[in-house]
Amino acid sequence: AITVHLVDGDGCTITVAPKGFGSENMSRIQMLKPADGVEGFKKFVIETVKLAGSNPCPPIVLGVGVGGSFDKVAYLAKKALLRPLDVPNPDPYYADLEKELLTAINELGIGPQGFGGRTTCLGLAIEQMPTHVAGLPVAVNVSCHVTRRASAAL
């Protein structure tokens, strides 16, 4: 997919993020109810990893989107995979949620290649946007341990 963002200036930045489909097949989207709240959100993210098991070649990297609409939340999850692992969400609430989910996922014990252990997920990034009061869209984009990206400015 090609996504274009128009910004001020006279330059262009191109980012490429090749991704295997084994991990893509483990990605999920869910239109939660607002009453599900943050607990429902966390449950869905953790359940996604649990259901994936060894299929996405863990340790994995997760991009999580929340908010927007059906199409936007999937975009947010994919966009989250572009954020470097050592850069938390700028919103302290979501940064704390990233840490909490990473800990919970690593406590699942799936481990590298599904052989067990404490390193199931190398990193997790959440991207969010406002949504309609009647919905709580959530998407989890799963990527394997060789998550990679490259950017060039022209």
Positions of the model-derived regions?
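Non-transmembrane, aqueous-exposed alpha-helical and coiled segments at domain scale
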Residues: 1, 5-64, 69-154
